[in-house]
Amino acid sequence: MLGEKCAVKCADEIIVLSEGVQSYFREVYGRDTKFIPNGVNRPVIRKAELIDKKFGLKKDEYILFLGRLVPEKGITYLIEGFKNVKTDKKLVIAGGSSDTDEFANQLKEMAKDDDRIIFTGFVQGQLLDELYSNAYIYSLPSDLEGMPLSLLEAMSYGNCCLVSDIDECASVVEDKAIIFKKSNVGDLQSKLQEACEDARRVQKYKDEAADYICEKYNSDDVVERTLELYRR
């Protein structure tokens, strides 16, 4: 809170990553800000080679979560919902702990009776690229987000995404992803089951995702908007 007040009082300009945060500064402090979101460019799609060797993962045979293992990401909803989905697909939880391993251990305890659920730990480089490139669905079931870069990245790889209906996710995907009610395990499970049974619908979202997100949140445009602000 002290940092916010200092920024409001002293900063020449304030850049925010989401329209929700922009509204917050306006309502709480009466301060105008500049909304400049995260950006992405189209990546190189990689075949499932390293992830196959390390985890036995093949293209379109797994649902992916990739991010920090913290409560606000909604991973417990995803695990609970997935455990009741009738599918041979795996659930891959990729990412490391934030401060301690306590929450990660809770997640592993939740998942221990379902051998379809795989924890990869922190990933980067080729592993990360392959996980994004070959997922059947990418899910971000968060209760709270700023500007979810992982969602932009997932769509840039051409993923069908399943996200919670919080503004920070819904405003990014618009009608180009599957949306479920925040914190609602039943709705999440239902949407997962439907997606696992309807490959044609999933493919439709995949076909639209990359072009849409790379145009809407192009990183070159983001850089130019930031430079324009500094030139003033």
Predicted regions and their residues:
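Membrane-proximal helix-turn-helix segments that form the acceptor-binding/catalytic region
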Residues: 1-13
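Carbohydrate-associated surface elements
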Residues: 20, 39
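Conserved acidic donor-binding segment of nucleotide-sugar-dependent glycosyltransferases
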Residues: 178-186, 194-200
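Short hydrophobic beta-strand element within catalytic cores of glycosyltransferases
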Residues: 160-163
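A conserved mid-protein helix/loop that constitutes part of the nucleotide-sugar donor-binding site
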Residues: 61, 65, 70-84, 105
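Nucleotide-activated donor-binding/catalytic signature segment of Leloir-type glycosyltransferases, i.e.
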Residues: 104-123
